[in-house]
Amino acid sequence: KNGNQQLLHDVGEQMQMFNAVAGVPAYYQDKLLAVLLLGEKHDGFGFDQQELDFFAALASDVAMAIRNAQLFMDLKKEADKNHDLFIRTMVVLSQAIEVKDKYTHGHTKRVTDIAVLVARQMALNESADFEEEFYENLYIASMLHDIGKIGVPEEVLNKNGTLTKEEYQIVQLHPRHGVEILSPLSELKESLDGVKYHHERYDGKGYPEGLSGEGIPIIAAIISVADAFDAMITDRSYRPGMTKAQAVEEVKRNAGTQFHPVPVKALVELYEKGRL
């Protein structure tokens, strides 16, 4: 009630400024949301009842529009809050695997950063036309691309020597494990292809399904390049990491066989610009 009185008081003070001769209140339920100010009629006569009824109906429509806008903004704030919580949850999930696999510390963030840079460079080259939503799906898929390694025994993940055939087969299951873990979350539907297919090869010799060429979802093809590049430049117990220059040359050499050529081209351009 005090708010309504204050609004009416403010309007009364400003009516002279707007040369208004009357004001029609716009209420939503018992809350005054606005006042529709009426100027003097051209003919100099006062407003008749029909005209006042029209402006009263218009004010009611204005009040409803304002209330709808307020409700929309409230919903958007709530959605943004929930979305931020969702993203933070994804970050926590991605960190879970790094606790288990000591050789991947920082790997997830680096892959995510590189993947998004590659996608934006592809768009800059006009070799791809991504909606903004794609970048978010890529971001999430990159963060969670190795989440399925939670299902791989630590002695296999952290083995210093060469994996046996059986151990390698266990590791190859991690994309499927990742999808099994994440598929109950409907919000991740558009990111699952990146998790499932980031170990597919352009020549069809990858896993888990042996997809090839353009049959590999582009979100997965981008993560594949970013993942491999970071793995190459990272020190492991059994070998030192390559320099970035060496890794870029290795990725280029495998374009069209292991990697989709388009994200490879974007990665090379990023390196040449000093952005990797």
Regions found by a protein language model. Name each.
Residues 6, 42, 49, 78-80, ...:
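Metal-dependent catalytic cores of enzymes that make or break cyclic nucleotides
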Residues 12-18, 46-47:
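Short loop/turn motifs at secondary-structure junctions and domain boundaries
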Residues 19-27, 34:
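A short, aliphatic-rich beta-strand micro-motif
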Residues 26-29, 41-43:
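Sensor-regulatory modules in signal-transduction proteins
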Residues 34-35, 149:
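Short glycine-/small-residue motifs
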Residues 35-45, 51:
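Short beta-strand-to-loop transition segments that serve as allosteric relay/switch motifs
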Residues 56-63:
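Allosteric cytosolic regulatory segments
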Residues 62, 68, 75, 79-82, ...:
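Heptad-repeat alpha-helical coiled-coil signal-transmission segments
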